[in-house]
C-alpha cells in the first residue's frame, strides 16, 4: 500500500497547531479545512492532463486541463465533514458520497448506520476523508462498502494516522493509497491516537 506522509512545512505547522488542548472550535475547523486542502493537492498530483485550445484574451491559446477525471469525495460521518470543504476547493464539481460509521467505544468495532453513494461509482476515483485513522476499523468498513458498490480506485486522506491503523488498512486493502499529515506514535488503551488531536468530531462540531 502506498503511504504518503506529507512533510510540507505548512502541513506540519498547521497540524501542530491542531494539537493544542484548548483550541477553539472555530480554529480547529479552519485548520481541518486547510490541511484537508493541502492533502488534496498532494493526492491529486498524479492526475493526467491534456492539451485543450481555448479562446484567450488575444486569440486561441493552448492550455493544460485535467483529463476526464471523475471523482467522488466520501466523508465518513461525522468528522469527515470537517475536511470536505478543503477538498472541494480544488474540485468544486466533484460528486459527494456519504457514509455514516461510528466506533463503538466499548468494542472499538465500526457500526454502520447510513450510506448515500453516487451513481456510476465504478467510473470514479473515491477520495475517502476522515480526520483520524486509529484502529482502521471505520475506514476499512467504508472501503468494503465502496468496493461492493463497484468502486475500483480509492485514495484515503486523513489528518493523523496511527501505525496500527495503517497496518490494518494495508492488510485489508493493499491497493488503496493513504495520504496523511502525520503518522503518530500509536494508540492508547482506549484506542485513541497519541499524541493525536483528541476527539476530532467533538472539536469540529463543538460537542462533548
UniProtKB/Swiss-Prot annotation:
Pfam families assigned: UPRTase (PF14681)
Chain residues that bind 5-phospho-alpha-D-ribose 1-diphosphate: 78, 103, 130-138, 199
CDD domains linked: PRTases_typeI
Cofactor(s) required for function per UniProt: Mg(2+)
GO molecular function per UniProt: GTP binding; magnesium ion binding; uracil phosphoribosyltransferase activity
SUPFAM superfamilies named among the record's database cross-references: PRTase-like
Reactions that this protein is recorded to catalyse: UMP + diphosphate = 5-phospho-alpha-D-ribose 1-diphosphate + uracil
Xref: Gene3D superfamilies: 3.40.50.2020
EC number(s) on file: 2.4.2.9
Cofactor note: Binds 1 Mg(2+) ion per subunit. The magnesium is bound as Mg-PRPP.
Record comment: activity regulation: Allosterically activated by GTP.
Enzyme class: transferase
InterPro entries, A to Z: PRibTrfase_dom, PRTase-like, Upp_B, UPRTase/APRTase, Ura_phspho_trans
Protein family per UniProt: Belongs to the UPRTase family.
PANTHER family according to UniProt: ADENINE PHOSPHORIBOSYLTRANSFERASE, URACIL PHOSPHORIBOSYLTRANSFERASE, CHLOROPLASTIC
Protein name: Uracil phosphoribosyltransferase
Native species: Aeromonas salmonicida (strain A449)
Gene: upp
Amino acid at each position: 500500500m502506498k503511504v504518503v506522509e506529507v512533510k510540507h512545512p505548512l502541513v506540519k505547522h498547521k497540524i501542530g497547531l491542531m494539537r493544542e488542548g484548548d483550541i477553539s472550535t472555530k480554529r480547529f475547523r479552519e485548520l481541518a479545512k486547510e490541511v484537508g486542502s493541502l492533502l488534496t493537492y498532494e493526492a491529486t498530483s498524479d492526475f493526467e492532463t491534456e492539451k485543450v485550445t481555448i479562446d484567450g484574451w488575444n486569440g486561441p491559446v493552448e492550455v493544460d486541463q485535467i483529463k476526464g477525471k471523475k471523482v467522488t469525495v466520501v466523508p465518513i460521518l461525522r468528522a469527515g465533514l470537517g475536511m470536505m470543504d478543503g477538498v472541494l476547493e480544488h474540485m468544486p464539481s466533484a460528486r459527494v458520497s456519504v457514509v455514516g460509521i461510528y466506533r463503538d467505544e466499548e468494542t472499538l468495532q465500526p457500526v454502520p448506520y447510513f450510506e448515500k453513494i453516487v451513481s456510476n461509482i465504478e467510473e470514479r476515483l473515491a477520495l475517502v476523508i476522515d480526520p483520524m485513522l486509529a484502529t482502521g476499523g471505520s475506514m476499512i468498513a467504508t472501503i468494503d462498502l465502496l468496493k461492493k458498490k463497484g468502486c475500483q480506485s480509492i485514495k484515503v486522506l486523513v489528518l493523523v494516522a496511527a501505525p496500527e491503523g495503517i497496518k490494518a488498512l494495508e492488510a485489508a486493502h493493499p491497493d488503496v493509497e493513504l495520504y496523511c499529515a502525520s503518522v503518530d506514535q500509536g494508540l492508547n488503551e482506549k484506542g485513541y491516537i497519541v499524541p493525536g488531536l483528541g476527539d476530532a468530531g467533538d472539536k469540529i462540531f463543538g460537542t462533548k
